[in-house]
């Protein structure tokens, strides 16, 4: 009674509270009224803006009279006109903004709670920034609406202040960033959280799609994996597995041919039985391999079957315990399978389950299970083991019994005879105890023939080691220094040494080329460029389209669109040839769909190379039309080759060398090769054209270049005496004098220079080609001294017959300096990474758009227009064939002074003096006396004492250091006087 009254009292109290709370207080009433007025005002503004008509009278204009078409009446027309004038297109968003503001005000806290002025201040600031930036962006990007600006007066004023300073792009970027800042100030939402939300949403969508794709397979995988988990407790889990298998059969509607044994049928369909089948096949294959190895070993050692079996059962041939355990498990599985074939259906199920567990090779097989299997083995299995004894008597009986036996028994027999490990593991089983009693004669054979077998094995090991050592020293794939090659009968190498490709038909699909031409015209028209294809020149690698531009179209517009054209035409790279010599057209080079390889044999067999008479003729490749392109190194006279790694630079240098080897004998051309990488040019070691060994030490490279400078000066002296201008005239005059019977002697010979009593005759001067494979490495190790030597050779060595081939993979300004570029006008540029590298090599762009693999730009001497060349390819076999051909003709005659550095004064650079002939300063003796007495060897002390300049004092101190009077400067700059002090009188 009391509880019921209490419940009634509580109900009355709650009802009274609900009645009191349903009424609004003063502040809540004000907020709700503001919400109603805000929604009403936004609806009125929407109607006025959507039904605005420019003909209505408004604040911007007066009307001639007539009806007002605005649904908001005259007031609506005035309001819409004012909003459009102030905000432009943004006026359409003001009703929505008004509704949002009133809703936020309606949802604010109660009047007794604290108002955060900082928060509301940032919100108002963000709202103002959003409105201003939105008006500015609308004014820039959208068309005007009626006679109003798209951004209103706010956008016009803002852009009029920003555009003169920031331009269009800068103003747009500034307004966008300001808009983002205003959005953050207004809403308090971080842009990082927006990015994270988008990323998580994308990942969720991807995960949902993947789960959707995998959804069909989940129902099949779950029941398949369940029997494996229950395999440890198999007797209890067997009914549950059978029930699940029956459900799967009903769902998949697979007909059961044997309804009496549904479990066996389902186990055949399980994927888990696939590794079991593979494992059995692997075991049998491995056993067959062991049997084959056993017979092969018996054949090699000339041993009988009995000796082979004794060796298999010997203790020395036993494998490790891990392999023994593994073999035992395989045999247990096989025995289980045999017993299963001769038992009931339930026994078949247990045997198959047991064989599945063997796959795991873990602690699955227990001793109790092994005992069960041993008890289940019946008499036929024992007969199989008993029949193994007669198989060891002779080989014929062994093969006959093996062919007639059943597969399972032969399998066990092979395992017994070839692997003693298996018998050792099964000896603990009840079945395997009888195996040891079957063949008691095996131990006697082992004791009698063990020593003889070990001797045979030791002899075979000794012979095999000797054969391996001989094969290691006589490997045909190694480079042989001294080879006796047959001397060729031809004076120069023949084309048979090079690789000759099969005859290729130059099939040109005219329809495809015309289609590409129309595509080029249409893509150029997309960029508002009117051009017409007037010529198509297909080549082995690229095809050039010649364009006739419309009047007023600049070539620079097409050059700036090269990357866009490559993207539009789905090409790897597009190169624009701005000027074609002799034609008023612009070239557009596109790569072919199928690229052809230009082989060295094709160019050497061409008339251009065959008709060339200069011994320094070099092969470059083929031009865009497929014509062979060769050049004369004597007219270049030096060439600079540059390109990134893998662009074909080293192959191009090898092609130049091989082409000169095809044209010149050692009497005509000699080489000095500098190879810092020790790989590219070392293959030419031993050819008779070399003046010195291939230089791989960079310290010797400067000596070789210095020798070239001395040889250049010597040749100039000889040519001045002969009255000729170049090496060609010198050799011709020598020949004329020899034919006339008046050979010319060395005019600079002096008595004592040699053991001869009369001056020697002048000989023919060969061309000298200096090849540097990696010029950047040489500059890095030796320094600027190499640059001075190369610059001197490049300036004066042309007439003397000395030519340079410089290759580098780092085409930077610190390697290819202005001094080198000014004296080497001929350049070859392979693919480079940037336009800056292309300008460093060629003084113009284009090399960055090449296709690689021998594609190059050739800048001939005396021209500023490059030629697109597809470099010839020479394989390593071609290089070795030509080199071996020249090695068979003779050996090189090296000049030791080239690398040793013993040159005369003519090889010194301007201003450089030899160390032995260096003149001492006239004050040297006085300075020595002063330094020895004062025990101070500073430059400033010498300068003050003798009143000379700093440079002269420093030079004298360096001479003192060279003579060993003072030491080198220490870490503090002081020098120690090494000479002893004079004795005191």
From Swiss-Prot:
Compartments annotated for it: namely: Cell inner membrane
Q: Major location, coarse class? A: membrane
Sorted alphabetically, which Pfam families does this protein's record hold? FtsK_4TM (PF13491), FtsK_alpha (PF17854), FtsK_gamma (PF09397), FtsK_SpoIIIE (PF01580)
**GO BP terms:** cell division; chromosome segregation
**Gene Ontology cellular-component terms listed:** plasma membrane
Residue ranges annotated as Cytoplasmic topological domain:
195-985
Q: Which PROSITE patterns match?
A: FTSK
The UniProt entry, under InterPro entries, shows: FtsK/SpoIIIE/SftA, FtsK_4TM, FtsK_alpha, FtsK_dom, Ftsk_gamma, P-loop_NTPase, WH-like_DNA-bd_sf, WH_DNA-bd_sf
Q: Where is the FtsK domain?
A: 626-839
PANTHER family listed in its UniProt record:
DNA TRANSLOCASE FTSK, SPORULATION PROTEIN RELATED
What is this protein for, i.e. what is its function? Essential cell division protein that coordinates cell division and chromosome segregation. The N-terminus is involved in assembly of the cell-division machinery. The C-terminus functions as a DNA motor that moves dsDNA in an ATP-dependent manner towards the dif recombination site, which is located within the replication terminus region. Translocation stops specifically at Xer-dif sites, where FtsK interacts with the Xer recombinase, allowing activation of chromosome unlinking by recombination. FtsK orienting polar sequences (KOPS) guide the direction of DNA translocation.
Read off the domain note.
Answer: Consists of an N-terminal domain, which is sufficient for the localization to the septal ring and is required for cell division, followed by a linker domain, and a C-terminal domain, which forms the translocation motor involved in chromosome segregation. The C-terminal domain can be further subdivided into alpha, beta and gamma subdomains. The alpha and beta subdomains multimerise to produce a hexameric ring, contain the nucleotide binding motif and form the DNA pump.
| Subunit | Homohexamer. Forms a ring that surrounds DNA.
UniProt lists the family membership as follows: Belongs to the FtsK/SpoIIIE/SftA family.
Name listed for the protein in its UniProt record: DNA translocase FtsK
Organism source for this protein?
Vibrio vulnificus (strain CMCP6)
């Amino acid at each position: 009674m009391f509880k019921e009254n209490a419940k009634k009292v509580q109900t009355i109290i709650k009802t009274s509270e609900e009645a009191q709370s349903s009424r609004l207080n003063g502040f809540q009433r004000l907020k709700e009224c503001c919400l109603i007025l805000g929604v009403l005002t936004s609806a009125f503004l929407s109607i006025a803006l959507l039904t605005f008509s420019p003909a209505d009278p408004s604040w911007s204009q007066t009307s001639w009279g007539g009806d007002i078409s605005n649904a908001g009446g005259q007031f609506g027309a005035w309001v819409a006109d004012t909003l459009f004038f102030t905000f432009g297109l943004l006026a359409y968003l003001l009703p929505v903004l008004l509704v949002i503001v009133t809703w936020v005000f309606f949802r604010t806290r109660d009047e007794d709670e604290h108002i955060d002025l900082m928060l509301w201040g940032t919100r108002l600031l963000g709202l103002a920034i959003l409105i201003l930036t939105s008006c500015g962006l609308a004014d820039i990007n959208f068309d005007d609406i009626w006679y109003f600006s798209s951004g209103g007066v706010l956008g016009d004023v803002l852009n009029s202040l920003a555009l003169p300073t920031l331009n269009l792009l800068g103003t747009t970027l500034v307004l966008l960033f300001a808009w983002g800042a205003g959005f953050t100030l207004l809403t308090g939402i971080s842009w990082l959280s927006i990015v994270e939300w988008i990323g998580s949403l994308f990942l969720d969508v991807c995960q949902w799609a993947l789960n959707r794709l995998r959804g069909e397979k989940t129902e099949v995988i779950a029941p398949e994996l369940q029997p494996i988990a229950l395999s440890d407790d198999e007797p209890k889990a067997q009914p549950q597995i059978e029930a699940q298998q029956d459900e799967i059969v009903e769902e998949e509607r697979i007909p059961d041919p044997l309804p009496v044994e549904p479990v066996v049928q389902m186990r055949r369909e399980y994927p888990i039985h696939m590794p079991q089948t593979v494992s059995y096949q692997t075991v049998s294959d491995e056993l067959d391999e062991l049997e084959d190895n056993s017979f092969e070993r018996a054949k090699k050692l000339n041993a009988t079957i009995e000796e082979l079996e004794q060796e298999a059962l010997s203790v020395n041939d036993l494998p490790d315990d891990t392999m023994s355990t593994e073999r035992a498990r395989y045999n247990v599985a096989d025995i289980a399978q045999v017993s299963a074939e001769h038992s009931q259906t339930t026994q078949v199920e247990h045997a198959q389950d047991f064989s599945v567990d063997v796959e795991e090779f873990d602690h699955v097989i227990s001793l109790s299970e092994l005992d069960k299997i041993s008890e289940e083995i019946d008499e036929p299995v024992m007969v199989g083991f008993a029949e193994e004894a007669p198989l060891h008597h002779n080989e014929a009986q062994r093969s006959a019994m093996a062919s007639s036996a059943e597969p399972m028994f032969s399998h066990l027999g092979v395992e017994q005879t070839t692997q003693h490990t298996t018998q050792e593991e099964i000896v603990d089983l009840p079945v395997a105890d009888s195996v040891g009693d079957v063949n008691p004669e095996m131990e006697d054979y082992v004791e009698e023939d063990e020593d003889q077998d070990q001797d045979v094995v030791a002899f075979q090991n000794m012979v095999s080691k000797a054969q391996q050592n001989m094969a290691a020293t006589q490997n045909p794939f190694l480079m042989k220094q001294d080879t006796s090659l047959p001397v060729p009968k031809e004076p120069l190498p023949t084309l048979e040494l090079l690789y000759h490709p099969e005859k290729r038909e130059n099939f040109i699909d005219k329809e495809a080329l015309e289609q590409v031409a129309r595509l080029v015209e249409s893509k150029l028209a997309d960029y508002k460029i009117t051009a017409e294809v007037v010529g198509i020149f297909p080549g082995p690698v690229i095809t050039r389209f010649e364009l006739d531009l419309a009047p007023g179209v600049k070539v620079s517009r097409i050059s700036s669109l090269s990357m866009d054209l490559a993207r539009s035409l789905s090409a790897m790279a597009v190169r624009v040839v701005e000027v074609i010599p002799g034609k008023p057209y612009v070239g557009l080079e596109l790569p072919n769909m199928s690229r052809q390889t230009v082989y060295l044999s094709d160019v050497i067999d061409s008339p251009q190379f065959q008709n060339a008479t200069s011994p320094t003729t070099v092969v470059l490749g083929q031009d865009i039309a497929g014509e062979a392109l060769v050049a004369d190194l004597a007219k270049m006279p030096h060439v600079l080759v540059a390109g990134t790694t893998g662009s074909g630079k080293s192959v191009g240098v090898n092609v130049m060398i091989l082409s000169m080897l095809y044209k010149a004998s050692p009497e005509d051309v000699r080489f000095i090769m500098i190879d810092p990488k020790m790989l590219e040019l070392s293959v030419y070691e031993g050819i008779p054209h070399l003046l010195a060994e291939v230089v791989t030490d960079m310290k010797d490279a400067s000596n070789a270049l210095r020798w070239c400078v001395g040889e250049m000066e010597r040749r100039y002296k000889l040519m001045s005496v002969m009255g000729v201008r170049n090496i060609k005239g010198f050799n011709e005059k020598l020949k004329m004098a020899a034919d006339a019977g008046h050979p010319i002697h060395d005019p600079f010979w002096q008595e004592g220079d040699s053991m001869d009593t009369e001056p020697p005759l002048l000989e023919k001067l060969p061309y000298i080609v200096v090849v540097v494979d990696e010029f950047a490495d040489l500059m890095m190790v030796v320094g600027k001294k190499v640059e001075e030597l190369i610059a001197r050779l490049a300036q004066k060595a042309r007439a003397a017959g000395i030519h340079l081939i410089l290759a580098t993979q780092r085409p930077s300004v610190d390697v290819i300096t202005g001094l080198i570029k000014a004296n080497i006008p001929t350049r070859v540029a392979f693919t480079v990474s940037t336009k800056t590298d292309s300008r460093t090599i060629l003084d113009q762009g284009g090399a960055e758009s090449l296709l690689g693999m021998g594609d190059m730009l050739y800048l001939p001497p005396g021209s500023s227009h490059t030629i697109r060349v597809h470099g010839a390819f020479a394989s390593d076999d071609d290089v070795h064939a030509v080199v071996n051909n020249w090695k068979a003709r003779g050996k090189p005659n090296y000049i030791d002074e080239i690398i040793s550095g013993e040159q005369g004064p003519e090889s010194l650079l301007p201003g450089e003096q030899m160390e032995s002939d260096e003149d001492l300063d006239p004050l040297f003796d006085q300075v020595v006396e002063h330094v020895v007495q004062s025990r101070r060897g500073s430059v400033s002390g010498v300068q003050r004492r003798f009143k000379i300049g700093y440079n002269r004092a420093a030079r004298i101190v360096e001479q003192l250091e060279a003579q060993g009077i003072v030491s080198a400067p220490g870490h503090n700059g002081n020098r120690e006087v090494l000479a002893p002090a004079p004795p005191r009188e």
